[in-house]
Amino acid sequence: MNYIGLSAYDTANGPGVRVSLFVSGCTLRCKGCFNKESWSFTAGRPFTAETEAQIMKALDSKWIAGFSLLGGDPFESEHEAVLAGLLERIKERFPEKTVWAWTGRTFKHVEKSRLLPYIDRLVDGAYVQKLHLAKQGAWRGSSN
């Protein structure tokens, strides 16, 4: 699995200050997507043990509220094994931190995912450009 971004101090993707991972790869390709560079599964860098160590170190602070998982689309089947393991380890080590995840798929399409048991808030559904939300803090791109 590759990723295109890792932010240790993100305030745009969930409540409070968060650690955010942007995975590479999305087959949905929503019109108007804000993150088109993430569509390719080979974009960015490989996710390694060192990447996970960076995430764990960043989460190990009282003022970090949680972990946000974005993309690309974290629910692409190619990501499931790596991300399920990562989320399990995050929840074991930091049970007080919330995990948020975004997907362009609906809940019905991801309800059997191995990621769901570790996610506290799922923001689901494809981005619809004509329903764009400009309000900061809405935590989703469109109102659908």
Regions found by a protein language model. Give the residues of each.
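N-terminal pre-triad scaffold of radical SAM enzymes
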Residues: 2-29
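Conserved Radical SAM active-site core
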Residues: 1-6, 17, 35-100, 107-112
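Hydrophobic pocket-lining residues within nucleotide cofactor-binding pockets
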Residues: 26, 74, 106, 127
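Short glycine- and Lys/Arg-enriched binding-loop motifs that mark or flank ligand-binding interfaces
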Residues: 10-12, 67-68, 121
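A structural signal for short, well-ordered beta-strand segments and their strand-loop junctions
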Residues: 100-101, 123
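Classical nucleotidyltransferase
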Residues: 116-144
